[in-house]
Amino acid sequence: MIFEKPEDLERERNAIEKFVSLFGGSYQKLGQFDIDFKVFDKDKTLIAYVEVKGRKKDMSNAYPLPISLEKVSKLVGKRLNPVVVWACTDGIIYGKVYELTGEVKWGGRPPREGSVNDDELMIYYPKQKGFKYLKF
């Protein structure tokens, strides 16, 4: 069952567009059970894979930044520059997975009817040098 609402998809789109605007790139949305995006440079060369996570907080109050360990594993499995972008209310926080250090623990969100993976192994990233910030 897919739980993304239209506003979640809009937040995701705004975040990826802000990210690729850094270098005049483009993106391609991947399948619903894959990570979120392939990212291309201005010459249409594949340069990264990106997972976008919604965070309904301002960047200054967003920490620790959560993400499913399974999502990170799938992202790293793509091998080419795995990047996570957290879409906050006032901008994006992003970083290359290989440059980040987080704490793994059981967590997630309150279970929703029809969901089998709301409680799962999560990575929680504290504020650190590997993160970059862009305001909307």
Outline where the language-model segments fall:
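Acidic-basic catalytic patches of nuclease active cores, encompassing PD-(D/E)XK
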Residues: 1-31
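Conserved catalytic cores of phosphodiester-cleaving nucleases, focusing on short active-site segments
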Residues: 37-58
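Short acidic/glycine-enriched loop/turn segments that link adjacent beta-strands
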Residues: 31-35, 91-92
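A structural signal for short, well-ordered beta-strand segments and their strand-loop junctions
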Residues: 29, 49-51, 83-87
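Non-catalytic C-terminal interaction segments of nucleic acid-processing enzymes
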Residues: 3, 21, 40, 87-136
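Structural alpha-beta junctions
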Residues: 21-25, 76-83, 104-105
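Generic structural signal for beta-strand residues in well-ordered domains
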Residues: 30, 42-43, 75-77
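Short, charged, amphipathic alpha-helix that recurs within catalytic cores of restriction-modification
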Residues: 59-88
